[in-house]
């Protein structure tokens, strides 16, 4: 598919969802507030793309994405017609997640000196722009449920559904943090150079960090349920988008190919693949 078509689809589909999910009557600059914030998310990616392309560097890619999450979340808080503790909680959860992951990925890419995913992309303006645009789509699609809650003028009672969503977020966030920390410690040990991780959470799932991320965004979507009505139910596509992207497009498939290149001939690795669940951890 041509880059311009990919870019157009990556902008139009999430922006359409943002327009449908916008709480009634909440505007920014005369337009639906959620749509304006979505467009702003893309604009931040495109602005960051310019110096990144000139320097042929991806070192600030993940950090830009995390800062975009925080920027649109704080902007939503600023323009929201309502201010209740559940809305503040949802905003805080997004900011905590984005701040933690942004710092982690920024430190990792600087320690590694780069990200191999971009080796053949950053030298092409069109392909690199696609990557930055897709990050904008990722931000908009994953955060739309949270932003819908923050912008809402309704005050539904906080009940079991909201609490269950918060618990899902907490469990998912904890799993992601622990998995990332375990892998970082594994890589930092010189004795593990050239080896694959199969200890800790990684002994129970081949991709526990992705499981945690899918679970936490599912939690945000569940927390949004009491606030949804009409076309706003479209935001429940958010966790499905996260799942699809991580399991079918850029996450697990990419790592699976790299794993086969590095350890495909290792019987221990093949045994690990056969005995360890791909995503949902074995209890």
Each language-model region and where it sits:
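Short, charged cytosolic
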Residues: 31-34, 101-109
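Membrane-helix interfacial "entry" motifs
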Residues: 25, 29, 33, 58, ...
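Loop-to-helix transition at the N-terminal end of transmembrane alpha-helices
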Residues: 28-44, 58-70
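Interhelical loop and helix-boundary elements at the membrane-water interface
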Residues: 1-4, 52-64, 106-134, 261-270, ...
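Short, amphipathic, aromatic/basic-enriched membrane-interface segments that mark the entry/exit
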Residues: 2, 31-36, 53-61, 203-208
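Hydrophobic transmembrane alpha-helices
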Residues: 3, 7-25, 41, 45, ...
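Short juxtamembrane and helix-loop transition motifs at transmembrane-helix boundaries
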Residues: 21-29, 49-56
